[in-house]
């Protein structure tokens, strides 16, 4: 957190193993969310062995990222088997609208039919409970990857997608399906 506050680097990027902003009710996530009987994420049932410290560390990281005075507050992560982008404007009582924290699910390269969260967990990735996020791309369960270009004044992202079962000949002509710039 001190590095985010004191760094003179143009960009400081956080790359946690579990995503920031979205959940599928998995055990090791930052969030206490579980899939409820109504098909929505909920915190009414305690998640087995979940620790409050996970969310407290998440909250500290988001506060430090939003407080950065240089560069883009940015998290890149995978592990939800999806492609997505959003700007976190609220986390609980914390208001980040002045400097939203950008979060990107960079995509899985080889998930099969039973590996998608909607198949394995019964829910696609959803915005975690207590998070306010402006999504420019809601989580999309497709194989793919993200190319991130770091420029002095901005970050440009290009997302590519692929679905198993499509002809391999299409890979040579793969084009980005979603592009966005983070100023």
PLM region spans:
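Long, structured stretches of catalytic cores involved in phosphate-ester chemistry, encompassing
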Residues: 1-183
């Amino acid at each position: 957190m001190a590095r985010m506050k004191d760094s003179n680097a143009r960009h400081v990027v956080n790359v946690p193993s579990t995503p920031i902003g979205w959940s599928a009710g998995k055990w090791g996530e930052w969030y206490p969310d579980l899939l409820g009987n109504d098909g929505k994420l909920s915190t009414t049932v305690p998640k087995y062995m979940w620790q409050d410290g996970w969310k407290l560390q998440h909250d500290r990281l988001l506060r430090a990222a939003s407080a950065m005075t240089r560069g883009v507050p940015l998290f890149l992560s995978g592990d939800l088997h999806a492609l997505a982008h959003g700007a976190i404007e609220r986390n609980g009582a914390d208001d980040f609208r002045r400097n939203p924290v950008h979060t990107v699910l960079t995509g899985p390269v080889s998930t099969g039919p039973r590996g998608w969260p909607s198949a394995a967990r019964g829910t696609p990735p959803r915005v975690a409970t207590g998070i306010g996020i402006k999504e420019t791309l809601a989580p999309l369960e497709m194989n793919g990857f993200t190319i991130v270009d770091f420029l002095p004044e901005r970050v440009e992202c290009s997302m590519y997608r692929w679905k198993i079962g499509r002809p391999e000949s299409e890979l040579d002509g793969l084009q980005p399906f979603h592009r966005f710039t983070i100023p």
